Amino acid sequence: MDHLPMPKFGPLAGLRVVFSGIEIAGPFAGQMFAEWGAEVIWIENVAWADTIRVQPNYPQLSRRNLHALSLNIFKDEGREAFLKLMETTDIFIEASKGPAFARRGITDEVLWQHNPKLVIAHLSGFGQYGTEEYTNLPAYNTIAQAFSGYLIQNGDVDQPMPAFPYTADYFSGLTATTAALAALHKARETGKGESIDIAMYEVMLRMGQYFMMDYFNGGEMCPRMSKGKDPYYAGCGLYKCADGYIVMELVGITQIEECFKDIGLAHLLGTPEIPEGTQLIHRIECPYGPLVEEKLDAWLAAHTIAEVKERFAELNIACAKVLTVPELESNPQYVARESITQWQTMDGRTCKRPNIMPKFKNNPGQIWRGMPSHGMDTAAILKNIGYSENDIQELVSKGLAKVED
């Protein structure tokens, strides 16, 4: 297989990934592959571009490093071109409502007829099967959070609240990435492809497991947070200092002992309620939980963030200032690791955004192009799989493909 023009880099160089999906969840999976060196083809509708394009800045991050193909993959010759593309594809990711592809004739079996080794990842809100009431419903971030039990655990004691920005989309996209790579490993070993059914609500069910386990195995449901503090453990969560907010985790035997000395509670150490060797202070079950919070609040309010960070570093207590977005760029850790970078968009503008993560030492990722325009690479991709100029123009004239003007 001849690859499309692009630099060779990263741990996934030589891999061809194709995705069909809009907005965040499915495309985020494609984005991760592209940043790690895979050749990633982004399929868009011919008549309507991906709705993410209406956003002024985010698409330049979420669609960088991609090749843009505008093709009607469900109709006539457009479908034929798509299936021919699948013959040279390693991983195909589609994000839609339930078994939408199967309903329109593109089943796993049809795809495997063209490429027996193909890894197929289906990403939807409620899965490829189940009840009619749910399977075919549309879903976005908040829907998956609400249906999974994740949303009800977040927010404040007075009201549940979704976790933003778009947590379910990113978790689901990353799940698609890791699952597809696991399936690819097996497919290369056996010569047999795989189909992966990723339901966004099940991803969030898994991510929300920590507190749910107490309900499933004892009928006890954890309360929601109060003003950003951990619902279970004292000394954990969001706290206010004299000049702003920090988060902290009071975890560990020596950490608790030394912190209690600072806040005036050393006399409680070694009591039946806080025996020697205590590693966590339970906010509810420990009768001194409210007192610990009261004393800690008072101590923190009397000190600046810098003073707290310095003291907690001495005590090995994990804490961090709650940074504002403008503070990120000048933070020395961000600067040292180049966590924020910039590149040129396709129209020559400078775009500043988060850098590639994680950082591979021997085969690092790379940003080699900005977001392509609608249909920008259609002709190049179709030529790559054997189509002539006349073939491409015929697809365009029938409204089955769009090429860049």
From Swiss-Prot:
Catalyzes the reversible transfer of the CoA moiety from gamma-butyrobetainyl-CoA to L-carnitine to generate L-carnitinyl-CoA and gamma-butyrobetaine. Is also able to catalyze the reversible transfer of the CoA moiety from gamma-butyrobetainyl-CoA or L-carnitinyl-CoA to crotonobetaine to generate crotonobetainyl-CoA. Keywords: Cytoplasm, Transferase. It is found in: Cytoplasm. The active site is at 169 (nucleophile). This is L-carnitine CoA-transferase. The gene is caiB. Belongs to the CoA-transferase III family. CaiB subfamily. Coiled coil: none annotated. Pathway: Amine and polyamine metabolism; carnitine metabolism. It comes from Shigella dysenteriae serotype 1 (strain Sd197). GO terms for molecular function: L-carnitine CoA-transferase activity. NCBIfam families: PRK03525.1. Its EC number is 2.8.3.21. Its main location: cytoplasm. Homodimer. It comes from the Bacteria. PANTHER family: L-CARNITINE COA-TRANSFERASE, SUCCINYL-COA--D-CITRAMALATE COA-TRANSFERASE. The keyword Transferase applies. CoA binds at residues 97, 104. It catalyses: crotonobetainyl-CoA + (R)-carnitine = crotonobetaine + (R)-carnitinyl-CoA; 4-(trimethylamino)butanoyl-CoA + (R)-carnitine = (R)-carnitinyl-CoA + 4-(trimethylamino)butanoate. One of its GO terms (biological process) is carnitine metabolic process. One of its GO terms (cellular component) is cytoplasm. Pfam families: CoA_transf_3 (PF02515). It is an enzyme of class 2 (transferase).
